[in-house]
Amino acid sequence: MKHNLQDNLQGEQMANTNSNGGKKPFSDAKIIERANLLRDNDLYFFFRAIEETEASTVTVKGKKQIMIGSNNYLGLTHHPAVKEAAIKAVEKYGTGCTGSRFLNGNLNIHEELDEKLAAYLGHEKAIVFSTGMQANLGALSAICGPKDLMLFDSENHASIIDASRLSLGTTFKYKHNDMASLEELLESNMSRFNRVIIVADGVFSMTGDILRLPEVVKLAKKYGAYVYVDDAHGLGVMGPQGRGTMAHFDVTKDVDFNMGTFSKSFASIGGVISGSKDAIDYVRHSARSFMFSASMPPAAVATVSACIDVVQNDETILNNLWSNVEFMRNGFKELGFFTYGSQTPIIPLFIGDDMKALKMTKWLESKGVFCTPVLPPAVPKGETLIRTSYMASHNREDLSTVLEVFAEAKKIFDIPNHLH
């Protein structure tokens, strides 16, 4: 049954018309109602099957598209040295580890990667998890106990929100990148808890803005709090040789825990937590998502190691990335798009209206541009955007084409130049 998309896109609850023998059917769930509305109107842009990938293009439904929705910032998924390392690892170790690192799934290359990442990030120790999500879930739920407090930015990643729910500690949000809001919570709560941990993204995934990390560090020192940075979108991109947001601000020694993922710049899957020797040893023996999950597959481990080598030895990769970012940022500015002041490879484009964003995404796809609409609740109501992101492997011809297509789209869909 088709419903009115405009009236129901925000997720109003539909009536339950199927008793299903007394069991409430999942088809009546609000999220399924919304998904069906999008499907009915041919505006469902989730789970798009990508049939082939190249340096910065993908094939969907037999049609090649310029990919500007990927987190493959360094463009290393097709780098010859990276692919060769993955293949050699499979030949030596097989396709999987079939066990937890805690027991039978700990390969020597896992430990070598731990050490390599610790040196790369500038911390005493590091430990590799199977995914970035598991790294946050495991580490945060381990270090925030019943007598502890977690203070986190209101725009943090979902994994931090879920970790706060898993932890036995108390959790409070502070306003996004608002140091006055953070200090108010620190001042009123420090004496009530054993440990206080400030948790924030290094680069925020939707708007691409950067954590005011030096100010966070200053407040942490003033009040005696720990600092935990989720640098999923900063690792490999920010700072010298892509060492991350804490290196970008030269505050590595002041960050107690640094988390990174390998599913973005490092062309693989997995996550890492780095910090002091004692802190990481504690996480190693306490993080349930680490202890009770099978370890990273050998090919994934070798891929990450090779990516670190590439970014450390070939400065043209980061130079190309930032050149492309500057080109697109200036291009969108000239076209009159509001980009939230982003200074990273994530360049969000304010659209405002949900329907307009969905229809524009469909139109862009028809013109050979793959991008991602971001709707509430991922962003505040009325601030729907199209999230674009850029890679070192993009060529200038494709990026110029993207700008030409967006120039036409802005006129067709009457996109505003600023937030309402």
UniProtKB/Swiss-Prot annotation:
UniProt keywords, alphabetically: Acyltransferase, Cell inner membrane, Cell membrane, Cytoplasm, Lipid metabolism, Membrane, Pyridoxal phosphate, Transferase
Cellular-component GO terms for this entry: cytoplasm; plasma membrane
CC cofactor: pyridoxal 5'-phosphate
UniProt binding sites for pyridoxal 5'-phosphate: 132-133, 233, 261, 263
CDD domains: KBL_like (cd06454)
Protein topology in the membrane: Peripheral membrane protein
Catalytic activity reported: L-serine + hexadecanoyl-CoA + H(+) = 3-oxosphinganine + CO2 + CoA
Any one Pfam family match given in the protein's UniProt record, by short name: Aminotran_1_2
Cited PROSITE patterns: AA_TRANSFER_CLASS_2
Pathway: Lipid metabolism; sphingolipid metabolism
Biased composition (Polar residues): 1-21
Enzyme Commission (EC) number: 2.3.1.50
Activity-pH dependence: Optimum pH is 7.0 to 8.0.
Regulation affecting activity: Significantly inhibited by palmitoyl-CoA concentrations greater than 100 uM.
Keyword Flavoprotein (UniProt): no
Molecular function (Gene Ontology), one example: serine C-palmitoyltransferase activity
Compartment(s) where it occurs, according to its Swiss-Prot or TrEMBL record: Cytoplasm; Cell inner membrane
Quaternary context: Homodimer.
UniProt similarity note: Belongs to the class-II pyridoxal-phosphate-dependent aminotransferase family.
Role: Catalyzes the condensation of L-serine with palmitoyl-CoA (hexadecanoyl-CoA) to produce 3-oxosphinganine.
Record-given protein name: Serine palmitoyltransferase
Species assigned in the record: Bacteriovorax stolpii
Lineage: Bacteria, Pseudomonadati, Bdellovibrionota, Bacteriovoracia, Bacteriovoracales
